[in-house]
């Protein structure tokens, strides 16, 4: 009636699979004990050892599942005739899969009890601001609380994003009740409080950014130790001047997009520092500066800075 249109940038998947953590998130937890490492790696070790022995694990790792909507011909054949995985070709695929998982595990990609889901603000607070004109809306979620329907009320959740360079392990309390389920329960998003600094810690906005939400008692305990006295980093980022759009400006923008934003050298330097036997206050300060440089580099094509 009003000639309005809506555009979906990203659509939430019907099925969200379990995720793997990465080395950047693990390297900032610098005081893990050998016993804790053994517990954290247990799921990945069991998964690797069960390839070819456990039917369900084997099929899942080969992508032969009902929720895989884009199966290859090989996967379709296995769905029709599962015994095919005993064929020589299938055995070769399993060997390569196992080799890949071992390589990933050595590189810090470990199986965890978590998944990636969209980040969303407290939309109840947004409605208070938008429709009621409240300049400081209260919302439903308090500071330190999140809502994610895939977890129970009272669960402690680690909320993580990549790139993860500084110590960015916010642990939040999941809150669920009838009122919260009514307002937030239609999606699998993780909803964050408008009173919380979590958006500053993780450097996210709400235009399709995703978060790795983990429920793990050991990782949570380690993270709490390492997050003691850690406050969010804050720095003013430069902004590009406004220009009239023309072919030349569009061309220069595309050129910048393909030639800027190489954060690899910066993040590699951060990893080298975290790899030291003992992390001193001076090294933490250097990591803070490099983290800022990394974020400036990521947005350099937009800000025309650096």
Task: Enumerate the predicted regions with their spans.
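Conserved small-residue
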Residues: 1-201, 221, 240-306
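Short beta-strand elements
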Residues: 131-132, 210, 216
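Short hydrophobic-aromatic micro-motifs
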Residues: 158-160, 211-214
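Short active-site loop/helix that positions an aromatic residue
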Residues: 200-202, 213-229
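Feature representing long, continuous alpha-helical segments
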Residues: 212, 232-235, 292
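Short, conserved aromatic-histidine micro-motifs
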Residues: 226-245
């Amino acid at each position: 009636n009003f000639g309005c249109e809506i555009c979906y940038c990203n659509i939430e998947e019907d099925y969200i699979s379990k995720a793997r953590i990465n080395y950047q998130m693990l390297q900032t937890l610098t005081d893990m004990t050998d016993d804790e490492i053994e517990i954290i790696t247990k799921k990945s070790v069991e998964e690797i050892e069960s390839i070819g022995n456990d039917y369900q694990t084997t099929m899942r790792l080969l992508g032969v599942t009902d929720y895989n909507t884009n199966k290859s011909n090989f996967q379709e054949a296995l769905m029709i005739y599962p015994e095919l995985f005993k064929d020589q070709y299938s055995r070769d695929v399993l060997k390569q899969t196992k080799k890949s998982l071992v390589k990933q595990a050595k590189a810090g990609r470990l199986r965890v009890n978590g998944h990636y889901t969209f980040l969303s603000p407290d939309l109840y607070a947004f409605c208070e601001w938008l429709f009621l004109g409240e300049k400081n809306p209260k919302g439903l979620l308090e500071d330190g609380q999140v809502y994610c329907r895939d977890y129970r009320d009272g669960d402690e959740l680690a909320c993580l994003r990549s790139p993860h360079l500084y110590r960015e392990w916010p642990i939040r309390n999941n809150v669920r009740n009838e009122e919260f389920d009514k307002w937030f329960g239609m999606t699998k998003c993780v909803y964050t409080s408008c009173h919380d600094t979590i958006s500053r810690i993780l450097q996210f906005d709400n235009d399709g950014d995703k978060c790795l939400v983990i429920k793990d008692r050991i990782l949570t305990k380690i993270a709490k130790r390492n997050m003691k006295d850690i406050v969010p980093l804050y720095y003013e980022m430069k902004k590009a001047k406004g220009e009239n759009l023309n072919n030349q400006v569009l061309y220069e923008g595309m050129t910048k997009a393909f030639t800027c934003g190489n954060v690899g050298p910066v993040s590699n330097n951060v990893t080298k520092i975290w790899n030291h036997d003992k992390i001193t206050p001076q090294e933490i300060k250097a990591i803070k500066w490099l983290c800022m440089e990394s974020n400036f580099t990521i947005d350099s094509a937009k800000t025309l800075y650096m």
